[in-house]
């Protein structure tokens, strides 16, 4: 197997010499570490190390770490042991939280390449699990052999074409011991249910199921790559300064609309929503009445239709401050991170006089019942915001401009007090920050 590993060394790894093995001490990672030690013997330029992630979830965790240290010492491989605290929250499973903790450790590695020991059986299990979850082409492409883990760092899975039984024979032939995680026997976990109950029966009926599933994953990876390419082109064509042009998005076919929004979310670093929620948002965006603002709420923020654009707004980290003093600098914009935006200025025929802005003006949030002086009577601020098409989600963080005496001078970007306005004055413009 070491000969095959060296023969099929990926071109993408040329010129990279610092390799770190994710080392649990189980059969698979023992096999990978041994194989890379053999490769190191033939290619001395390879720098090899290992990392063991101590999750602290098993009473045997300390013993596993000690086993890993002993084996690495015998193979003359430097080992670092990283202890992590696994916290599952928001409906996340302990298994998923532990996986994320491991990958955080891998991302912090000083090595250029992180090598993991996933094999052909793991790949088959992953494909079936994704299928049972209703995954699309990207999910069914399963685990790639090589991908970027972090800037300047690659994740490599060199064993994906090798079944577990071959790895077991290899490890036994070399006399290595390995540890068994007792949680791998718990069939309450779906992967273990597949591994111990379902796949053995499938193998009896279809002995070559692993290679067939691997081929299916390869085809799905090709399909996913084409989808991504088209989605990136559509996304670029639909982009505007403020988000996506709604008309351009809705001119696409329904599948391309969905893929464009998924590509947009991916570019923002936001996870994909449930397919049904995305479909409903697009339906509402297409048929919403003028002035309506359909919203798709996500953990990181929300997507919404605002006038003729689709916009992404990050979730506010805190309530706006009770008040913020205006720092008047002769029309220079003022960045207001605590409000989530920037206050800019334009000279207009009927704007706020500079004298009022220089003498104690301040910003404050809506509290309800505010009214602004108009040509005839006074207008309620809530009506001005609604008529301007400001989505309800943004109204509570839309700052109002007051004079030192507490008089409402302006709703930035929307209206200026008729009573306070003067020729050659200044119009405040509110520019909410976007991700």
Curated annotation (Swiss-Prot):
The keyword Nucleotide-binding applies. NCBIfam families: lysidine_TilS_C, lysidine_TilS_N. This is tRNA(Ile)-lysidine synthase. InterPro entries: Lysidine-tRNA-synth_C, Rossmann-like_a/b/a_fold, TilS/TtcA_N, tRNA_Ile_lys_synt, tRNA_Ile_lys_synt_N, tRNA_Ile_lys_synt_subst-bd. Belongs to the tRNA(Ile)-lysidine synthase family. It is found in: Cytoplasm. GO terms for cellular component: cytoplasm. Gene3D superfamilies: 1.20.59.20, HUPs. The keyword tRNA processing applies. HAMAP family: tRNA_Ile_lys_synt. GO terms for biological process: tRNA modification. The N-terminal region contains the highly conserved SGGXDS motif, predicted to be a P-loop motif involved in ATP binding. Ligates lysine onto the cytidine present at position 34 of the AUA codon-specific tRNA(Ile) that contains the anticodon CAU, in an ATP-dependent manner. Cytidine is converted to lysidine, thus changing the amino acid specificity of the tRNA from methionine to isoleucine. It is an enzyme of class 6 (ligase). Pfam families: ATP_bind_3, TilS, TilS_C. Keywords: ATP-binding, Cytoplasm, Ligase, Nucleotide-binding, tRNA processing. PANTHER family: TRNA(ILE)-LYSIDINE SYNTHASE-RELATED. ATP binds at residues 24-29. Its EC number is 6.3.4.19. The gene is tilS. It comes from the Bacteria. GO terms for molecular function: ATP binding; tRNA(Ile)-lysidine synthase activity. It catalyses: cytidine(34) in tRNA(Ile2) + L-lysine + ATP = lysidine(34) in tRNA(Ile2) + AMP + diphosphate + H(+).
